[in-house]
């Protein structure tokens, strides 16, 4: 059994890829149980399943209820905030609120919410700003911490976080790829910073990672997305590999599908870059996460 203990704070277990479905087509058998088993083998103790819309949050919760190690978040991702306006925005918000309020213990965070100005083709800036701010009603009423998303929107994101400082009880900005200054400003607001493969692409990213106090860090995979690619600056620090096939085969990872077991690779990069003992860092990351989401 692994010496390491992990909480994967961002895992998209409701993604059809873990059921063998790609773009609506069944390509291989449902292997979710194998994916979970591989993660447990390397030390994942809790999985925080990300909710990215009202329906997605319902699906995440439903899956979370099938396993004691599974938990979920409730919120609306910035690229999907136009869903608020497909019917009544107040009704949509009320749906999110009742889901979070009625399932405490399984629902551990409000999110994924925030701003994403890299993908405005999915949802315009004004809509994102309006409904990110609206979701502080959820954090305020439930007193749950936040699971946050910030892409190419640091100034506006910080403005909103500062303005609503007394309406949230903490949280994490996941999949962080911002600057040292951005990280420091978020830490000043009492927030934690989550790292995954997308956070470790460039040498500049690695410099940012070095600058953040370990007691403000968390770890995640964002699987099936955000795997570490061989072109990423962080990849040279990976020691652990998994039997992987280009075409699906039982008992193997699949080449272009990230999995929660790969969290060990994120730890290896983080500990090497920061020159910290992997076990010590893993324990710090685990304790940070328990403190924010599970105590």
UniProtKB/Swiss-Prot annotation:
Transmembrane segments: none
Binding site for a divalent metal cation 2: 112, 149, 174
Nucleus keyword on record: yes
Key words of the record: Hydrolase, Metal-binding, Nuclease, Nucleus
Details of cofactor binding: Binds 2 divalent metal cations per subunit.
A GO molecular-function descriptor: nuclease activity
GO terms for cellular component: nucleoplasm
Subcellular location: Nucleus
Keyword Hydrolase: yes
Annotated positions binding a divalent metal cation 1: 112, 222
Cofactor: a divalent metal cation
SUPFAM superfamilies with a match to the protein in the record: Metallo-dependent hydrolases
Residues modified to N6-succinyllysine: 27, 46
Superkingdom field: Eukaryota
InterPro entries for this protein: DNase_TatD-rel_CS, Metal_Hydrolase, TatD-like, TatD-type_Hydrolase
Residue ranges that the Swiss-Prot or TrEMBL entry lists as coiled coil: none
PANTHER family assigned: DEOXYRIBONUCLEASE TATDN1 (PTHR10060:SF15), TATD FAMILY DEOXYRIBONUCLEASE (PTHR10060)
Job description of the protein: Deoxyribonuclease which catalyzes (in vitro) the decatenation of kinetoplast DNA, which are circular DNA catenated to each other, producing linear DNA molecules. Plays an important role in chromosomal segregation and cell cycle progression during eye development probably via its DNA decatenation activity.
Family: Belongs to the metallo-dependent hydrolases superfamily. TatD-type hydrolase family.
Protein name per the record: Deoxyribonuclease TATDN1
Biological source species: Mus musculus
């Amino acid at each position: 059994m692994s010496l390491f203990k992990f909480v994967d704070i961002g895992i998209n277990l409701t993604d059809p890829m873990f059921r063998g479905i790609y773009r609506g087509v069944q390509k291989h058998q449902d292997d979710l149980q194998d994916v979970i088993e591989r993660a447990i083998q390397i030390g994942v103790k809790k999985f925080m399943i990300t909710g990215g819309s009202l329906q997605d949050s319902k699906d995440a919760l439903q899956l979370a209820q099938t396993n004691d190690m599974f938990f979920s978040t409730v919120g609306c991702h910035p690229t999907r905030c136009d869903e608020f306006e497909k019917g009544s925005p107040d009704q949509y918000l009320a749906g999110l609120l009742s889901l979070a309020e009625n399932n405490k213990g399984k629902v551990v965070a409000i999110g994924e919410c925030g701003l994403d100005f890299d993908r405005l083709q999915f949802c315009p800036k004004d809509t994102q700003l309006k409904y990110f701010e609206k979701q502080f009603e959820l954090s305020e009423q439930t007193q749950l911490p936040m699971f946050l998303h910030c892409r190419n929107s640091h100034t506006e994101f910080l403005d909103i976080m500062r303005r609503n400082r007394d309406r949230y009880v903490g949280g994490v900005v996941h999949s962080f790829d911002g600057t040292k200054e951005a990280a420091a400003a978020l830490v000043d607001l009492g927030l934690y910073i989550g790292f995954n493969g997308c956070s470790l692409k460039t040498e500049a990213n690695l410099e940012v990672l070095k600058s953040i106090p370990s007691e403000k860090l968390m770890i995640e995979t964002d699987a099936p997305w955000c795997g570490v690619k061989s072109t990423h600056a962080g990849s040279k620090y990976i020691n652990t590999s998994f039997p992987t096939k280009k075409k699906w085969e039982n008992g193997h990872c699949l080449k272009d599908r990230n999995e929660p077991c790969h969290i060990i690779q994120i730890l290896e990069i983080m500990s090497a870059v920061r020159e910290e003992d992997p076990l010590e860092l893993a324990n710090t990351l685990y304790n940070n996460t328990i403190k924010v989401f599970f105590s």
